[in-house]
Amino acid sequence: MKCPYCGYPDSRVIDSRPTDDNTAIRRRRECLKCGKRFTTYEKVEQLPILVIKKDNRRELYDKEKILRGMIKACEKRPVPIKVLEEITDEIDRKIVNSMVREITSAEIGEMVMEKLKSVDEVAYVRFASVYRQFKDINTFMDELKKLLKENEEKKQKE
């Protein structure tokens, strides 16, 4: 590894350990010429994931887009941003670990709705109304009735 101080092409590894999130290896190195120490990170190169949109266009997967959509759905709701970031990270890990090169926006949307439903039902309905493109009030009411029915069934089990 080239020394960032003197440019010498060789160094030795003094310490090597995984990062806190286990996504990279942190290495402390020492230049064999000037003796200065520096840190490098070794990380697996991720292949790009493409999202297939409803109109069959393809665009690069962007984890931040999931977070932005949930923030919008949770506007004026008592949902901490930390919770939304954790959900985003969980969905992102699921997508990346699936090793797929392409995923539909529908699959991502369903994952988001599944998580939002357990966090905040109002946010869930807001997200669903945009994601599922509710055409009129009847479609909206159908979703609310379904949610109410699920809640009743949940209460009966308890």
From Swiss-Prot:
For this UniProt record, give its keywords in alphabetical order, as a comma-separated list: ATP-binding, DNA-binding, Metal-binding, Nucleotide-binding, Repressor, Transcription, Transcription regulation, Zinc, Zinc-finger
unnamed zinc finger segments: 3-34
PROSITE patterns named in the record: ATP_CONE
Leader sequence segment: none
Q: Name one Pfam family in it.
A: Zn_ribbon_NrdR
Q: Does the keyword DNA-binding apply?
A: yes
- Which coenzyme or cofactor does it need? Zn(2+)
Cofactor notes: Binds 1 zinc ion.
Q: Does the keyword Nuclease belong to this entry?
A: no
Q: Which GO terms describe its molecular function?
A: ATP binding; DNA binding; zinc ion binding
Name all ATP-cone domain ranges.
Answer: 49-139
Task: Give the UniProt record's GO annotations in the biological process aspect.
Answer: negative regulation of DNA-templated transcription
Annotated NCBIfam families: transcriptional regulator NrdR
**What is stated as this protein's family in its record?**
Belongs to the NrdR family.
Q: What does this protein do?
A: Negatively regulates transcription of bacterial ribonucleotide reductase nrd genes and operons by binding to NrdR-boxes.
What protein name does the entry list? Transcriptional repressor NrdR
